[in-house]
């Protein structure tokens, strides 16, 4: 029962979005909306110069971001609490 209510609500929301997009004066709006909804890989394209929490690293090299240190035991970046 809960699943069918959720699907009905999701269908109504999708119908509202499609109806609003079709009435919009901007022709690129539906394409832009769909690209923003399904833009999952955009964050993967950005690379950092350092490694964050849980990333694998080599002890002795300064690969981890500030406030992180490479664990010699586990070989991944974790929070550096000081000495």
Curated annotation (Swiss-Prot):
* Signal sequence range: 1-21
The organs and tissues expressing this protein are described as: Expressed by the venom gland.
- UniProt keywords, alphabetically: Amidation, Disulfide bond, Ion channel impairing toxin, Knottin, Neurotoxin, Presynaptic neurotoxin, Secreted, Signal, Toxin, Voltage-gated sodium channel impairing toxin
Q: Mark the residues carrying the PTM Leucine amide.
A: 81
| A GO MF term | sodium channel regulator activity
Q: List the disulfide bonds.
A: 50-65, 57-70, 64-77
Primary location: secreted
Chain residues in the propeptide:
22-48
Gene Ontology CC annotation, any one:
extracellular region
User: Where does it live in the cell?
Assistant: Secreted
Task: Quote the InterPro entries the UniProt record gives.
Answer: Huwentoxin-1 (IPR011696), Huwentoxin_CS1 (IPR013140)
- Anything noted about its domains? The presence of a 'disulfide through disulfide knot' structurally defines this protein as a knottin.
Q: Could you share any additional remarks the record makes about this protein? A: Negative results: has no activity on Nav1.4, Nav1.5, Nav1.8 and Nav1.9 sodium and calcium currents.
Oligomeric state and partners?
Monomer.
Query: Per its database record, what is this protein's job?
Result: Selective antagonist of neuronal tetrodotoxin (TTX)-sensitive voltage-gated sodium channels (IC(50)=1270 nM on Nav1.1/SCN1A, 270 nM on Nav1.2/SCN2A, 491 nM on Nav1.3/SCN3A and 232 nM on Nav1.7/SCN9A). This toxin suppress Nav1.7 current amplitude without significantly altering the activation, inactivation, and repriming kinetics. Short extreme depolarizations partially activate the toxin-bound channel, indicating voltage-dependent inhibition of this toxin. This toxin increases the deactivation of the Nav1.7 current after extreme depolarizations.
* Family membership noted in the UniProt record: Belongs to the neurotoxin 10 (Hwtx-1) family. 15 (Hntx-3) subfamily.
Task: List the protein's name.
Answer: Hainantoxin-III 11
Look up and give the organism this protein is from.
Cyriopagopus hainanus (Chinese bird spider)
């Amino acid at each position: 029962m809960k699943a069918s209510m959720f699907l009905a609500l999701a269908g109504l929301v999708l119908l509202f979005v499609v109806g609003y997009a079709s009435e919009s004066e901007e022709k690129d709006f539906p394409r832009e909306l769909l690209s923003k909804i399904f833009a999952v890989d955009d964050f993967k394209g950005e690379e950092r110069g350092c490694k964050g929490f849980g990333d694998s690293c080599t002890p002795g090299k300064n690969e981890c971001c500030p406030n992180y240190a490479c664990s010699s035991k586990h070989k991944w970046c974790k929070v550096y609490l000081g000495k």
